[in-house]
Structures are given as structure tokens and as C-alpha cells.
Amino acid sequence: MEILQIVVLSLVVSSTATLFSFLIGFFLSLFIFLKNFILKKWLINFLNALTGVPTVIFGLCVLLLLSRKGPFGSLKLLFTPTAIIIAQFFLLLPLVIALSLDLFNGEGKKILETCKILQIPKNKIAKIFLKELIKPLVCIFLIAFSRAISEVGAVSLVGGNIKGHTRVMTTYIALSTSMGNYDTSIIIALILFVISFLINYLLRRKA
């Protein structure tokens, strides 16, 4: 029963964080792609740099924000599933934006140029743009979800790995292994492996 609860919680928090980061990241990257503004190049380089920052740093930042002495301490979100979602959201957002910008600057530009040559009405360009890029966008979503569900450091910091409340697959594996409970660790690891395998399979199908 505990294993099922851990798996469900992992899927729920990771899916929620991925969905929000993907939706917001998509529109932000589209805005950056279409608009010319001061420091645009610097912003893109900064976002790309954030994708390589150790995940535990994102967890620490969220921890400081949600801690009792932090600016959002009154919300009492620390060591809750919501805190995990927030940490994963900030972890995934730069990744989604960076990957989306790469897509827009590559295939996206070609689509817009083709639409311009063919003199396609502006009200139809958005529909064509999304239709042509739907498969790579789904790939970006799956990549983000894969990173979210495999996260350990940030999740441990803000979630606390509390049994029956904030314990997810990765933190459970880390704790059980440290305590010598290899049997249950292997079961959870196999479940996580199957999920990762399915994501990889879907990515190959969409590619």
C-alpha cells in the first residue's frame, strides 16, 4: 500500500509541475522568440546556463522562500507536496524555455518563412505553427517530466521525505538504500525504470 501511495504521489507532483512549467515556458519562449528587446541575447544565455545549475540549488532557493523566516513562510507550504511541485516547476522552467527556443529558432523560423512566402493569412499562421511543431513540443514535455520524476536533491530539501505525505520514489530509494532495505528499493527502482523506459520509447516514437 505504501509503495502504491509513493508511486501515485510521484506521478501527481511530477505531472503537475511539468504541466505548469510547460505551459508557462511555452508562452514565455514564444514571447522571447517573437519579440526583439534589450538584453534578449543575455536572457537566452542566462536561461541556458540555468539548465546546468545543480538541482539542489533550486531546492535550496525554494526552501529559503518557504521557510518560517522566508517571505512566504506564512503560507506553511514547506514539507508539503505543493513545495515539491514548486521546486520542480522552477527546476523545469529554464529547461522548457531553452528547448522551446531552440525549436522555434530552428524549425519555427522555417515555418514562418514558408508562411510568409506563400502569403498565408496571419490568422492561420498560429494554427499551422502549432500543428507542425506538435510532435517536438510533446517531446519537450516528456523530457521535462522525465527530469521531474527522477529528481532527488531539490525534492528532499523541500519535501522532507515524510512517510505518507511527501515521500516520492527517488527519495524512498535513497532512504531505503541507506537503511539497508534493498528489497523495497529494488521494487521502487524497477517501477521508476519502467516509467523512464516508457518515456524514452514515446520520445523515439515522436522523434
What does each model-found stretch correspond to?
Residues I3, V7, L11, L43-A49, ...:
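Hydrophobic alpha-helical elements at and bordering transmembrane segments
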Residues F58-F89, V158-I162:
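Membrane-interfacial helix termini and adjacent extracytoplasmic/periplasmic loops
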